[in-house]
Amino acid sequence: MKKLFSVITLLASISAMSQQNVFFDRSFWNENTSVSQVKTAIEVGNSPSALNEAAFDAPSLAILGNVPTPTAIYLIEQEGNSITKTTHDGRTYLFWAASSGNVALIHYLLEQGSDIYAKDTKGYIPVTFAALFGNTNPKVYEAFFRAGIDPKATYDQGESLLLKTIAFDSEQLPLTQYFISKGLKLKQTSLSGATAFDYASRKGNVNLLKTLRKKVKPTHQALPMAAEGVIRQPNNPIEVYQYLIENQKIPATATDYKGGTALHYLARRQDLPAAQYLIEKGANIEATDKDGNTCLMNACYGNNLELVKLLLKGKEHINKANGKGETALLIALQRSSSEVVALLLAQGADTRAVSKKGVNVIEALLASYNPRKKGNDKDFDQKAALLKQYLVALQGANAHGDTALHMAVVKGNLKLVEKICSWPSIDINAQNEEGETPLIKAALTAKDTSLLKLLIDKGANKALTTSLGETAYELVKENENLQKSGADLSFLK
C-alpha cells in the first residue's frame, strides 16, 4: 500500500508541475530520486532526452541534483542520450559528474569511453571543471589520472591542478599533498608568476594563507586574486584584505596579469565594505585594466547604488570607454537599475555614447528588457523616461537607420514591440539604410505571425519596399520558420 501511495503521490506531483517536462524542474532531483520514479515520469510523457532553454537535459540536471548513481546511469542510457551528447555550454555528462564529485559515475562514464579531453565552450576539460568547482576529493582526480590525464599538465595561464584547487584545500593541505605525491611542486608558479599562496587567497581563508606563508611567498597578485574570488562563492571576508595589505604589505593598487586591481573585482562583486577599505588604503578609483574597464564600469553590472556613488567620486572617468567602446552608462542601461542610470545621468554621463559595435543608449536600453525578471517592466519604463528627460530622441535611429522598433522586432518579443509602439513620435514605417521597415524586418525574422499582425494593427504599411523594391510579403517567403509552419501569410499582400 505504501508503494502504491508513493506512485500516486508522484503522479499527482508530476501533473501539478504543469505541462512542461517535469525533469526540467530542479526540485524533482535529489539524493533520493529513484529509477522507479524516473520510469514513472517517462511513462506519463516526460522526455529524458529533451533539452531545456539553457540546454540542460534530464541526466545533466539529475547529476547536478546529486541523484543516486543508478538513477543517473539509467537516464544516460535512455534513447537520445549518450556519453558524447553535449548539453549546457557544450558539456558532456562527464563534466557534470566531475563537478559534482560523483566518483562512481565518473568511473562508469570513463569505462564507457567518455572523452577526458573534450572541451566545453569555455575551454574547460572535465578534470579542470572539477577543479573550478572546488572538488577536493583526491579520488576524483585519481580517476582522471588513471584514464590518461597527466598529473603534471598545466592549463590556462600555466596553472597546474595544484594551483587551481589549493584555495579549496583545508589547512592540513591533504589535497595539495596528494598532488605533490604525483610529482607536482608547491613552489611552482603560473605564467604570470603567481604562487600557490596567491591562488590560495582566492577563497579568503586567512588561516590557510598563514600555513602556506611558511612555505611559499606571495606576490602582489594575491590581493586582486583574493578580490576576484572563486565561482559561485560569497564575497571573501574583509580580514583577508587586511591580512594581505597590513601584514604582507601588498599595496592596494596591486594588479594581476589582466591589469585588474582588487577594486575592479570588488566592484564587479558588489562588495561595498571591502571596496571602502581598499580606497582608504590607497586604491585608485580611476584605474583601468588591460581591456580598458574602470571600476565604475564593473560596478554598473550590479545594482549597488552606494557602491556606484563611492566610485563616482572621481567624476572625470564617468565617460571613459573600454576597449569595446562601452561606457558606464551603456553598461548600466543594459545591466543595472534605473536608480543607477539616474545617478550616472545626473553626474554627467554622455547620452551620445556609442560602442564599437554601434550600440547606442536606446539599443542598450532594449537589451535590458526581460519581462520574466521581477520588476523589469517598470524599471525599463523608468530608464526610457530618464533618457527622454535627458533629451534623448527615443524615436531616433542608429548609424544604420534602425529605430528602437526595428531593434525590438529583431528581438521578437511581442510585449517589447507593443511597448515601443506606444512611445510618442515613434514612426512605425521608418526605413533604415536598406529601406527596411519594422514590418519588413519582422517578415524576415518572425517565428510566427503574431508579430506581423501586431505591426499591421498598429498601422504598418504593407506596400513599402526595401531599396531593392521588395515588399514584406515577398520577403516573408525567405522566412523558413513561417514557411515550415504553413501559416496563411496572405494578410501581408
Where are these regions (language model features)?
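Ankyrin-repeat inter-repeat connecting loop/turn
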Residues: P48-S49, S82-I83, I116, P151, ...
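N-terminal signal peptide c-region/cleavage motif recognized by signal peptidases
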Residues: S13-S15
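Ankyrin repeat A-helix N-terminal signature
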Residues: E31-T33, L61-P68, W96-N102, F129-N137, ...
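Solenoidal tandem-repeat scaffolds enriched in leucines and small polar residues
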Residues: G134-D256, G260-H264, R268-R269
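N-terminal, post-signal-peptide region of Sec/Tat-exported proteins
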Residues: I42-S82
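Ankyrin-repeat-protein effector appendages
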Residues: Q19-T33, D150, K214-A222, A227, ...
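Ankyrin-repeat boundary/"N-cap" motif
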Residues: Q20-W29, A50-I63, K85-F95, K119-A131, ...
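Conserved hydrophobic site in ankyrin repeats
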Residues: A41, L75-I76, L109, F144, ...
